[in-house]
C-alpha cells in the first residue's frame, strides 16, 4: 500500500462546495494522512495556534482569498504575527477562483506563500507539490 504524500493538510475556505470538491481530490490523490477542512479563517487561526502548541502544524495549507470575516491576505498577516508560527515550516498555497491581477501580484510579493493555485485542485497540481 502506497503512503500518502504528506502527514497533514489544512484547507481554509468558506465555500462548502469547493471544500467538498477539493477534499475529495486530496483523498483521491492520497495527498495527506490527515485532511482538516475549516470554513472560517478565524476558526483556522485558533486551530493553528492549538496545533502549534501540540507540535502538530499541518505541512501544507490551502488558503482561499475571498472569505468573510477576513480575506486570505488578512489571514496571512495574522499568521505572520503569531509567535507560534515563527520558524514554522508550513507550505502555504493560495487557492482561489480569483484571477484579479492585483491579488496575483500580492501573492507573488508575499514570502509566506509558496504559490497561487486556481480552483479547483487537480491531480496534476497536487502531484507537483513537493
PLM ranges: what are they?
Residues 1-8, 16-21, 89, 115-130:
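Non-catalytic signal-transmission and effector/linker regions of two-component phosphorelay proteins
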Residues 37-50, 72:
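Helix N-cap/capping motif at the beta->alpha junctions
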Residues 3, 74, 89, 93, ...:
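Alpha4 helix (beta4-alpha4-beta5 surface) of REC/receiver domains from two-component response regulators
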